[in-house]
Amino acid sequence: MSKYQFKVEVLPRFLMAQSAPDQGLFVFAYTIKITNVGSVTAQLISRTWNVNDANGHTEKVKGLGVVGQQPLLKPGDAFEYTSGTRLRTPTGTMHGTFFCVAEDGEKFDTDVPMFVLDALSAGDARTLH
């Protein structure tokens, strides 16, 4: 195990009440849990997301922190947040990267492998490393 390592768990959900399928609007929430499974305290600085719909449209989203925060995680600490995205189709995917800096100055990326956004079956937990 690397001394610089975060584990990422994702739980996507379709939000029917905020969606308008007949107008091509499908809204999803996703809860992300980030756990520092390394041996060094590290801070999440920024994120990059690639959001893809079933028509091949890709939106790249970059920003500082997550939900307005840049959590500092000691070994064993976890941070959980919920955010959302909109698609033009009932299915799509997301994947991304968290850029992190450890307390010793080491910079590292934590990949968030692709997860599925599906208006019919969103809600199954996925553990991603």
Language-model features: where?
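Asparagine-centered strand-capping/turn motif at beta-strand->loop junctions
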Residues: I34-G38
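Short beta-strand segments
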Residues: F6, A42, E59, E106-T110
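Short, solvent-exposed loop/turn segments enriched in Ser/Thr/Gly
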Residues: L25-T31
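Short acidic, flexible loop segments centered on an aromatic residue
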Residues: V40-E59, C100
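Intrinsically disordered, low-complexity Pro/Gly/Ser/Thr-rich segments with frequent PxxP/GP/PP motifs
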Residues: E59-T91
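Short, surface-exposed linear segments at secondary-structure transitions and domain or protein termini
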Residues: D53-G56, G68-A78, L117-T127
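Terminal connector regions
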Residues: R86-H129
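Low-complexity, acidic Ser/Thr/Pro/Gly-rich terminal tails and inter-domain linkers that flank the onset
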Residues: M1-L25
